[in-house]
Every structure is written in C-alpha cells, then in structure tokens.
Amino acid sequence: GFIDDFRQSDSLVMIDPVLGDNGKLYTNFDEQMILEMRHLIRKADVITPNMTELFYLLDKPYKAENTDEELKAYLHEISEHGPGIVIITSVPVQGDPRKTSVYAYDRQGNRYWKVTCPYLPAHYPGTGDTFTSVITGSLMQGDSLPIALDRATQFILQGIRATFGYEYDNREGILLEKVLHNLDMPIQVSSYELI
C-alpha cells in the first residue's frame, strides 16, 4: 500500500483514526471501517484517537470515566498493535467537568504522559485534525513527546478561547488565523506530567 511504498527511514507515519465521538460511531461509519482502521494503525508510528475511537480500536465497550492506571493499560495495549506512540485526546477528568486531559504513551522509553487543561464547553470540527497537525510538526522539528503534547494542547486551547468570543458558526472550526502566530512563540513547559 501507499505507506509501505513511500515510507523512508526518516518518515513519521501519523494516523488520526477518525471513527466517532462521545461514545458513538459517526453516522456514516460501520464495523468494516473499524476493522480497516485497526489494520491501518499497525503501520503508524503515532496515533491520536479520542476516547471513543480508542475503545472501538480496542474492541471494548465505551467507558467515559477511567483511572490513570486503566488509561495506561489501554495505551500499552493499543501500542502492541503497532504504533510506538499513542496519544488519547478528549479524556474527561474524573470529578472535575471543567477540565480535560490528553494521555500519551511512548513505547520506546516506556513512559506515560498526561497534560490537563481547562475544558471549554464549545465544539468545533477540526480540532482533532489541528491537534494532530501540531503534534506532527513538533515531533518533526525535534521536540520531545511531552513538549509536543504541551504545544498542541496549548494551541488548541488558545484557538478555542479565541473563537469562543465571536458570533461564529461553530461548524467552521476554530479561527486558526487568530492564533497561528502562537506556534512560533515559546511554550509554557509546565502542564505535562509523567504518570
């Protein structure tokens, strides 16, 4: 396939396994799509599923609340299917609906990371795509995984905050042009933690 034909030694194969959200598959997706995605992620270096997609990829029933230990087990399990780095987005923080987290596992270093940030009650299509793009750019420029997580999480939060104040059709996604310049600025290396 395409990845096998074009992969180079310095390539980074990043897959955002778009399947669903909020515990449900997207309406135009079915079981066959899940099976194909399970096959595709075997070729990835990095995957960025949200919580819903994680459970579909693992063939487990969706569970909104999970402990750090459960999430670490899920990260490790899905990593065994191929990707060396697994990043789970949109992880609710137990007991605090005003926060959300991103969890990550780096199989090579056998380390787990978590970044927690404020949750804003706004939904914009494309935030997962933007998050994955920032992670990709950060890793390609040589940032460590925790720095890439910080950069992407902060950028998405800034984008949502910048967009939230405008009378704007949410279906248009976040107003990237309002925050794009922030990618050139130093990040606050303070929000990630090793778990």
Language-model features: where?
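Glycine-rich beta-alpha junction loops
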Residues: 19-21, 53, 90-94, 118-121, ...
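Charged C-terminal helix
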Residues: 146-195
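Short pre-catalytic strand/loop immediately N-terminal to key active-site residues, enriched for Gly-Thr
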Residues: 111-125
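Conserved phosphate/ATP/ADP-binding segment of small-molecule kinases
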Residues: 27-112
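Short, small-residue alpha-helix embedded
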Residues: 56, 123-145
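Short, charged, surface-exposed loops that flank catalytic or proteolytic processing sites
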Residues: 61-71, 140-151
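Glycine/small-residue-rich loop that forms an oxyanion/phosphate-binding "nest" at active or ligand-binding sites
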Residues: 1-39
